[in-house]
């Protein structure tokens, strides 16, 4: 089950290893958490039903992570230690299935440690790095290993004030900041077949846009070269301020580009990732407001 109120990127409770030989999972103990009444209005006669909710300053639930081995039928519990109320977030497996990476956040939510555990013994292997902020630290995404180099991974972080991508090795050394600027990476989509480029969407401004700053009203698809740290625009209609969503083919050669805006009905195109060229229009939705006089702000 999902834990920690589904915060910090947590949306599930089961995590298969890359080859499917083991299953990591959350276990949550709420016995120490006070009940909080919630009115159930689904029934004809509404009634109060208690839920477990940790109020500020009171006991929170305790979470542990287990690893079930399919071949032996045995479960190993990761030795995450104390304090037991810390948040265990963004679980990820190493490509060789020997280690598990967890972003551990303290109850105050101002310090995060990226920790590596042995999936075989449950022992803590290393604290790779720590992120702190006097206001708030919010890990949202697990480590993403490079497909052609299992000794390196990409980490998403807001440590400079904007959500950007960083390249680390498995010792915890930051090799480079892959993206930077006063804009945010909104989605990491995947790698090309050779693992040389990463496809993302972001609010990065560009020369075709009337914006010279990052804005959530203008999200485009980009190809990020991991070696050079350079981005190239993928979405051919980027001059139109709109929000793009990409779905990249397994080969990484093509992508489905879907976008719309308050004044642009849904448009879906097949594009070539080599140069962002539009190959074919798949859908151009009709304008539902055509013929109406719309109010202006």
Give each language-model segment a name:
Residues 2-18, 90-92, 139-151:
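Signature of short aromatic-glycine-proline-rich micro-motifs recurring in repeat-based ectodomains
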Residues 8-37, 49-73:
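Extended catalytic-interface subdomain
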Residues 12-15, 24-30, 55-59, 95, ...:
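Beta-strand C-termini and the immediately following turn/loop, strongest in propeller blades
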Residues 18-19, 95-96, 147-149, 192-195, ...:
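Residue-level detector of Asp-centered blade-edge/turn motifs that repeat once per structural unit
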Residues 22-28, 33-37, 62-64, 78, ...:
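Non-catalytic accessory segments flanking enzyme active sites
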Residues 39-53, 58-62, 107-123:
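Carboxylate/His-rich catalytic cores and anion/metal-binding grooves
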Residues 69-73, 119-121, 169-173, 225-229, ...:
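Short loop/turn segments that connect beta-strands within beta-propeller blades
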Residues 126, 164-180:
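Polyanionic (Asp/Glu-rich) segments that form extended negatively charged tracts
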């Amino acid at each position: 089950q999902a834990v920690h109120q589904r915060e910090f990127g947590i949306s599930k409770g089961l995590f298969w290893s890359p080859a499917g030989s083991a299953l990591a999972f959350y276990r949550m103990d709420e016995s120490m958490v006070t009940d909080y009444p919630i009115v159930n209005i689904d029934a004809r006669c509404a009634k109060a039903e208690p839920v477990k909710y940790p109020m500020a300053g009171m006991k929170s639930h305790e979470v542990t992570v287990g690893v079930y081995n399919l071949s032996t039928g045995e479960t190993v519990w990761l030795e995450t230690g104390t304090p037991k109320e810390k948040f265990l977030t963004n679980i990820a497996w190493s490509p060789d299935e020997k280690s598990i990476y967890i972003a551990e956040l303290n109850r105050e939510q101002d310090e995060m440690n990226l920790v590596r555990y042995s999936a075989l013994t449950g022992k803590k292997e290393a604290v790779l790095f720590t992120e702190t902020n006097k206001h708030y630290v919010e890990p949202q995404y697990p480590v993403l290993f490079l497909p052609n180099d299992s000794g390196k991974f990409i980490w998403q972080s807001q440590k400079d004030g904007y959500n950007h991508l960083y390249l680390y090795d498995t010792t915890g050394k930051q090799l480079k900041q892959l993206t930077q600027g006063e804009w945010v990476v909104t989605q990491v989509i995947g790698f090309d077949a050779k693992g040389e480029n990463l496809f993302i969407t972001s609010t990065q401004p560009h020369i075709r846009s009337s914006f010279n700053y990052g804005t959530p009203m203008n999200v485009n698809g980009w190809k990020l070269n991991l070696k050079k740290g350079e981005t190239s625009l993928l979405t051919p209609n980027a001059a139109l301020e709109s929000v793009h969503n990409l779905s990249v083919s397994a080969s990484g050669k093509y992508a489905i580009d879907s976008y719309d805006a308050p004044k642009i009905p849904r448009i879906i195109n097949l594009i070539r990732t080599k140069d962002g060229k539009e190959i074919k229009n798949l859908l151009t939705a009709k304008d539902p407001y055509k013929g109406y006089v719309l109010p202006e702000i």
